[in-house]
Amino acid sequence: MQWHRHTFESLPKNDLYALLRLRSDIFVVEQDCVYLDLDNHDQNSYHLYAKNTEGAVVAYVRILPPGTAYPQVSIGRVVVEKSARGKELGIELMVRAEEWAWDLFERERDVVIMAQSYLLQWYGRLGYVAQGEEFLEDGIPHRIMIKSNK
């Protein structure tokens, strides 16, 4: 597995296409959720992704600077390609994303995610704690979760 870290400006255009395709495959097609994925946050975000030995993007996450979606740094668009699931790749993806977020910004900062409710327990294993009530985002139940690095 090869890991890549980029700003929007430094993303190779073929990789940008591949990660947008992966996001669409999972969030729109697999989850049967019609929504606008391109939300104008990608340009100011940091992009972390993994490619398999064939060079295909199989995991992706974006890091949003504090003040973009939340007062804190946030991690979103967490995706692992279907054939790459069940191999702890999602855990490695999140750990790498958290470390990069804390390196980019203040290590003491909390990290916020908007988690699909069916993944609360999975994110909980990584140290995230649910906040507030469940809500619908694009017809899918979600909860805000926060991980403190204090």
Positions of PLM-derived features:
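Conserved beta-strand in the GNAT
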Residues: 49, 56-66, 71-74, 79
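Conserved acetyl-CoA-binding loop-helix of GNAT-fold acetyltransferases
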Residues: 80, 86-99
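Conserved GNAT acetyl-CoA-binding A-motif
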Residues: 94, 101-116
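A conserved beta-turn-beta hairpin within the catalytic core of GNAT-like acetyltransferases
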Residues: 66-75, 85, 105-109, 139-141
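Short amphipathic alpha-helix that is part of the acyltransferase structural core
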Residues: 1-35, 39-47, 51-56
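Acidic/histidine-enriched, beta-strand-rich ligand/metal-binding domains
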Residues: 83-85, 107, 114, 118-121, ...
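Conserved catalytic-core motifs of GNAT/GCN5-like acyltransferases
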Residues: 112, 124, 129-144
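A short beta-turn/loop motif at secondary-structure boundaries
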Residues: 38-43, 67, 136-137
